[in-house]
């Protein structure tokens, strides 16, 4: 099985670098020079990382054999994957976005919404919850607030501090993609409750 970890955006400069929309919570591990990715479409790859650097909040990658802006432009929109077998020796206590989306969000016995997404951020991960009235609520994915994740029973248990749901209601006009601003491809990052607290 393959896991998408990034989507290539626009070229940067004239030497073949590209911007990357990061879809993993461990970019420092996933994009080191020498890393080889399976690519979709297959005609664009495979690709091997030659260089990786950050420009403000945007990850810039260079790939072996990609040396011009035109070559970089041909990669725009390509998706980068790793084999999930590579993750087996890593920590098993995390969850991918596709495992969380659709789970009920419970406060005690009451269902207060449904998970619609996961945002992996440098400081802490955020669970995106859609409330019954259609609002988006952002909940910090830390053990103190999300003490239980039960994928088998399809729910998470939340113990929100006072005012959490009022404070963290998402403005529908706000965007927060780092890297290439695209039409919201929210492929999975892997998150762990309490990891980034």
Curated annotation (Swiss-Prot):
Segments of this protein annotated with the region Disordered: 167-197
SUPFAM superfamilies per the UniProt record, alphabetical: PRC-barrel domain (SSF50346), Translation proteins (SSF50447)
Keyword vocabulary terms for this entry: Chaperone, Cytoplasm, Ribosome biogenesis, rRNA processing
Task performed by this protein: An accessory protein needed during the final step in the assembly of 30S ribosomal subunit, possibly for assembly of the head region. Essential for efficient processing of 16S rRNA. May be needed both before and after RbfA during the maturation of 16S rRNA. It has affinity for free ribosomal 30S subunits but not for 70S ribosomes.
Organism in which the protein naturally occurs: Arthrobacter sp. (strain FB24)
Gene Ontology, cellular component aspect: cytoplasm; ribosome
Name of the protein in question: Ribosome maturation factor RimM
GO molecular function terms noted in the UniProt entry: ribosome binding
Subunit structure: Binds ribosomal protein uS19.
Primary location: cytoplasm
Family of the protein in this entry: Belongs to the RimM family.
InterPro entries named among the record's database cross-references: PRC_barrel-like_sf, PRC_RimM, RimM, RimM_N, RimM_N_sf, Transl_B-barrel_sf
Compartments where found: Cytoplasm
Biased composition annotated in UniProt, kind: Low complexity: 176-186
């Amino acid at each position: 099985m393959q896991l998408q970890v990034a989507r290539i955006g626009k070229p940067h400069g004239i030497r073949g670098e590209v911007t990357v929309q990061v879809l993993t919570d461990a970019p420092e591990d996933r994009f080191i020079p020498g890393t080889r990715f399976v690519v979709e479409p297959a005609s664009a790859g495979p690709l091997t990382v030659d260089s990786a650097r950050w420009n403000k909040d945007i990850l810039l990658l260079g790939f072996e054999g990609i040396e011009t802006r035109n070559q970089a432009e041909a990669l725009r929109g390509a998706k980068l994957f790793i084999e999930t077998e590579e993750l087996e020796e890593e920590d098993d206590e995390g969850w991918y976005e596709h495992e969380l989306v659709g789970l009920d969000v419970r406060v005690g016995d009451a269902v207060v919404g449904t998970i619609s997404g996961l945002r992996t951020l440098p400081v802490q991960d955020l669970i995106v919850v859609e409330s019954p009235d259609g609002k988006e609520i952002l909940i910090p994915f830390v053990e103190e607030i999300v003490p239980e994740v039960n994928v088998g029973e399809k729910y998470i248990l939340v113990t929100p501090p006072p005012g959490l749901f009022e404070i963290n209601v998402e403005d529908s006009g706000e965007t927060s993609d780092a890297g290439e601003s695209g039409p919201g491809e929210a492929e999975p990052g892997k998150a762990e409750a309490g990891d980034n607290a």
